């Protein structure tokens, strides 16, 4: 009877050890499984040179003569955790503020209608990621030749965090597209005030 208990105890220890090794292998594969790359693109929804349905309070007003909606990004980062805060370690830059201003400024009208531009491309450790953070420096809307600054929402200035699960595979490129909804993002303070703000509404599509 004592011998049977000893044998059973040994078996349980062996199984536990095997499970521990397997778990460690899986963890190692996820965290140290090589290097892939991530390309983040920018496209725009509902933005045309003919006009824009800007948000006014709870309604929309069609604004004609829209010639440009330019957005300057400070940086775009990704993180493995969906719960990571702005001050947490582990953010990886895909677009960073060291790049020239002209390379971080995009006209939403030029990336509408199925067009896109590349925000950034970088190598990343292979594995699972769950969050994209977008930080915007400034934005401008040009109507009938007159540029007007867009007041940026505080969230977009400190970091607009978008939850999106995606995987970077060893030796492969992953592409994410940020779909910037111009009509939902551009807001006018009051009808015909000419004072606009930007509260970004952004979706993410993986291709």
Model features per residue range: what roles?
Residues 2-13:
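Bacterial N-terminal signal peptides that target proteins for export
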Residues 27-207:
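A short, solvent-exposed, low-complexity linear motif enriched for acidic/polar residues
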């Amino acid at each position: 009877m004592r011998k049977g208990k000893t044998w059973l105890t040994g078996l349980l220890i062996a199984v536990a050890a095997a499970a521990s090794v397997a778990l460690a292998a899986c963890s190692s594969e996820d965290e140290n499984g090589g290097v892939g790359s991530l390309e983040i693109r920018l496209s725009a929804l509902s933005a045309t040179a003919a006009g824009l349905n800007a948000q006014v309070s709870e309604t929309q007003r069609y604004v004609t003569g829209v010639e440009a909606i330019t957005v300057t990004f400070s940086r775009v980062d990704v993180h493995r955790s969906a719960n990571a805060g702005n001050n947490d370690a582990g953010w990886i830059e895909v677009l960073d503020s060291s790049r020239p201003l002209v390379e971080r400024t995009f006209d939403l009208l030029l990336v509408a209608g199925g067009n896109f531009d590349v925000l950034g491309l970088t190598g990343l450790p292979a594995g699972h990621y769950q969050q994209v953070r977008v930080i915007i420096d400034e934005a401008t809307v040009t109507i009938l030749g007159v540029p007007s600054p867009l007041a940026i929402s505080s969230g977009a200035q400190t970091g607009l965090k978008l939850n999106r699960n995606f995987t970077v595979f060893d030796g492969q490129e992953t592409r994410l597209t940020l779909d910037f909804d111009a009509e939902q993002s551009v807001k006018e303070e009051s009808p015909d005030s000419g004072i606009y703000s930007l509260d970004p509404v952004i979706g993410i599509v993986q291709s």
